Amino acid sequence: QLGDPNAMVVATNDDAGPAARIVLLKGYDPRGFVFYTNRLSAKGRQIAAHPRVALVFPWHDMQRQVRVRGIAVPVTDQESDDYFAVRPRGSQLGAAASDQSQPIRDRGEFDARVRDLEARFDGRDIERPDHWGGYRVLPYEIEFWQGRRNRMHDRYLFTSRDGASAALDDGDAWSTVRLQP
């Protein structure tokens, strides 16, 4: 059984070096892979400065992994609004209350912010904060890895033929090679 199949590592970069964290894949289409976050967070600032990112889907229970390299671009405001509207209310409150990645005195200060927002939006929809939205990772490289006995793994690397991002459903845009374990 696969625990969180949509859990993925997003690796970004800044002047201090690489940074990685787990986020949830919230959608994909022929253009790429979508996740949502606070765009003022460390990852949001890193993406704004260096939009080339890596994703890893670590499916340990199946001895499989998918690795993606691509360019992160903001999704439209409409896509962000639509997704925010279907999030659980508690998640909406948390997104609106959090200055993600910024220091805070203690948990009580954050909890007070959430309570204030609950009171302010009592009986009303919570508006999506301007700083909260999605990114679509436009892939230019995807590797599929399958673990095998004695570390004789199977690996296939798909690379866009022109080196730029390519549509996932355009087979002619991708070249494929088998890699040694």
Protein language model regions, located:
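Binding-site signature for planar aromatic cofactors or substrates
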Residues: 1-181
